[in-house]
Amino acid sequence: MSCFSHVMNPITGQNSWQERGDDYDYHLEVANAGFGDMLHDWERNQKYFAALKKTIAGMREAGREVHVLDIGTGTGILSMMAVEAGADSVTACEAFLPMANCAERILAANGAGDKVRLIRKRSTEIQVGEDMPRKANLLVAELLDTELIGEGAIGIYNHAHAELLTEDALCIPARARCYAQVAQSPLAAQWNSLKTIANLDGEPLLHPPEQLKSCQGEAALHDVQLSQLPSSAFRPLTDPVEIFQFDFQRKLEREKQRAQLLTLQSKQPGAAELVFYWWDIQLDDGGEILLSCAPYWAHPQLKELAAEKGKDHPLANVLPWRDHWMQAIYYIPKPLQLVEAGKSFHLSCHHDEYSLWFDAREEAPTKSVRRHTCTCDLHMTYSRSRIGQINQSTRNKRYLRYLEENIEAEKSNVLVLGNGCLLGLASSALGAASVLLHEPHRFSRRLLESIVTHNQLKNVQFLDKVEELEDSQLSALTHVFAEPYFLNAILPWDNFYFGTLLTKIKDRLPESVKISPCSARIYALPVEFLDLHKIRAPVGSCEGFDLRLFDEMVERSAEQAVSLVEAQPLWEYPCRALSEPQEVLNVEFSSFTQEHSLKGSIELKHPGTCNGVALWVDWQLVEENSPRSIVSSGPSEPVVPGEFVKWDMFVRQGVHFPRRPTGGITHLEWSTDFKPVLGELNFSFGQKKL
């Protein structure tokens, strides 16, 4: 059977009914569950297996039976490890039914079907005597996320110890330690606050209003692959310090709320703007088997790992890769100026049942620091990458150069299209006679209204719909301007909604009106990822266990529910270029409704496995052949085949992952079909050996 789903098309801006199989949501959940990423984490798998072998052997030597409970078994991999290590009984639970059904088949295929009791429930719903015959004395689980406690580990462990485990039960992992490092980073700070927008001479055009300056921001973590943050982009103000321990093994309840006040000394002067955060886990009771999520500069095994990889590997790329446990940035509500090395200050560290937050102060706080929230609309409306993009100086300079060269004081009448377009507001500060700002989003509009009021801009009018514009307003326009950026956009070309809006008013615009950007080009680049491709790559076997049934399930679901191109922040995921970029679509916004059907081939100029195709948009501001008239969402430096690509850090690019990448390929064949009226933009890729 099929059903119809209400889907927003980002290019047309219209909701439409889309026919989908009635199991579409199931396939979407399976394809995006993230189990494959964990199974490609060889360090995690090896160390969990080693901890199980060591712990079970130790319990045996002590004359104890071993009854294992595996919470959130997924594929059943940890349960099979426990069986292999000699457990007397293994009970596994998995509440996600598609995964539980797959685990049942995997267990049978690996000869463990009759050795593992599989319960299709959450662990908090299990009853001893009804679901499992006895309490377990060994708990193995992977309940952690980047924040450590964000998936509810505290509550799950507390319930397990109270209801499902014996008094002397051991746990794998046994305990976790959380770390913080205070740092200054003008680059990372751009993801959190709004800077003054200045003209090309450095004179301020738009100042952030007081409510933005005083806003403490959102306490939510900003999860990133911290090792990929350039070392030149931050100044560590302290060494890493341990802030919390979580003992998963103790019978006593783990506290749901704690606070820790640390007195630290700065290593060098700077502004305490943010906290880098990560954790490690001791998988065995003795603490000998350690898995660290530290960035490379703080990793306890950096020297050994670097020696294994060799000198041709940058240090940032030598650590075992994982995307399910990363590092995080927490932004300090009010940055603290540390004027000299050795300056003492206080770091307040807090956690509740699911999250953490931090503050830095010169004087010790007299009461508990509450979790802060956004009060200015900026943080609650825009993503971290969009906030950074608004602040991106090199990008802004190209737009401002266009505006300064084209806006005539008291003569220009400008229509601005897009969400949160501060650069459009800058045309008012540059002296435009009038600025019509299309801003239908309530919170984004409220933010821009506060900026208009604070900067005393008198000639700005807000619009909900471009269709509401009077003929007299449209005929007076001299410029239509956009970045473009729209809140519904996920992939870079979703911002082609700019063309859709233009089409609605095109016939009523004067012939002399200047439209910027005038065109957009999509580029494709065949690449070899070091690791990112693993999120879609089949697992095959893991620690000697056959997981091909899992691969088949995920592949079936991915074919049903996963787009051929997905959005990723590629600066976090190193890749080498295998060729130069090639244009695969050119859209002129003056003739936006024209359909395109294109084909081509890219010759690979560097040996390697093409396990990804990166795609992005270049926006052409004016019709001139100058790099200064292009704003790119792709590489920030020229692409050289065989070298790592340096990507724009404030936007996500599109990525296509070939289903079965192979070596020896000489050409990447591509086709593009674009039907703008329908909002359909489809790519296909094939690998060929000539």
Curated annotation (Swiss-Prot):
The keyword Hydrolase does not apply. The keyword Methyltransferase applies. InterPro entries: Arg_MeTrfase (IPR025799), MeTrfase_PRMT7 (IPR014644), PRMT_dom (IPR055135), SAM-dependent_MTases_sf (IPR029063). One of its GO terms (molecular function) is histone methyltransferase activity. One of its GO terms (biological process) is peptidyl-arginine methylation. It comes from the Eukaryota. Its EC number is 2.1.1.-. Keywords: Methyltransferase, Repeat, S-adenosyl-L-methionine, Transferase. Residues 14-357, 366-690 form the SAM-dependent MTase PRMT-type domain. Belongs to the class I-like SAM-binding methyltransferase superfamily. Protein arginine N-methyltransferase family. PRMT7 subfamily. Essential arginine methyltransferase that can both catalyze the formation of omega-N monomethylarginine (MMA) and symmetrical dimethylarginine (sDMA). Specifically mediates the symmetrical dimethylation of arginine residues in the small nuclear ribonucleoproteins SmD1 and SmD3. This is Protein arginine N-methyltransferase 7. The gene is Art7.
